[in-house]
Amino acid sequence: DTQMVTVFKTKYIERLREYYFVGGMPEVVKDFSEKKDYNRVRAIQKNLINYYQQDFSKHAEIKLVPRLNLVWNSIPMQLAKENKKYIYGQVREGSRAKDFELAIQWLLDCGLIHKVQRIQKPDLPLKAYIDFDAFKLFLVDIGLLIAMTDLDAKVIIEGNKIFTEFKGALTEQYILQQLISDVGVIPYYYSTQNSKGEIDFLVQGKTSVIPIEVKAEENLKAKSLKAFCEKYQPSYAVRTSMSDYREQDW
């Protein structure tokens, strides 16, 4: 019921921002549902993050542990970039894929991060057009991502004028979690070789590829999505934002 969504829009946005901060880790959600205390939320999240990093030392080979920490700690910084493609050289200067591939795979196998591969050609089947050298990394939970940045609850819940670019990263993290919660959906992303005109997510429908453009607020300008639709003519496209629901043609 889109009219109902519009009527309760302000309340829904408040709850969404609350979820951004709290996230979905069971221990955090349980405590927040009982105490409604953002300080307790942050303390539990920090404990979870420390626990995960202690697990690196317990379960991974000793020589791999420093690289696990470097990859893990680099994810918020990598997502803060306008171009969110994972860059090895920004983890450690001069690094290449071979330096961190095992660490990334270890974190993937443990379910602590999600990997979104670039698609070279938005055609069916998407798996046939994966660019294995280009990808984005996201954390398992949006609340943990915010905790790793030390952003205060007030910035997330009430908003802040200087909190702009990273807001886009949080929105992508949230949309990713919603996509992968649907069994069988594998999100990818698309960009041209020069990285201009990126489509935040691509998913494979039964008979077509569905592009998804992610907007953090109500700005509906979507040059990349428009150009993509004009070139590839998908059956339909999706643009998420804080704006009211609408259907439109280009």
For each predicted feature, which ranges?
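Residue-level marker of alpha-helix boundaries and capping positions
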Residues: 6-7, 93-94, 166, 216
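Short, mixed-charge aromatic SLiMs
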Residues: 47-53, 94-99, 197-202
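Short, solvent-exposed loop/helix junctions and linker helices
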Residues: 65, 94-97, 165, 169
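Phosphate-coordinating catalytic segments in nucleotide- and nucleic-acid-processing enzymes
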Residues: 81-82, 97-98, 114-117
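Conserved Helicase C-terminal RecA-like lobe
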Residues: 91-96, 143
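A cross-kingdom feature that marks ATP-driven nucleic-acid transaction machinery
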Residues: 102-250
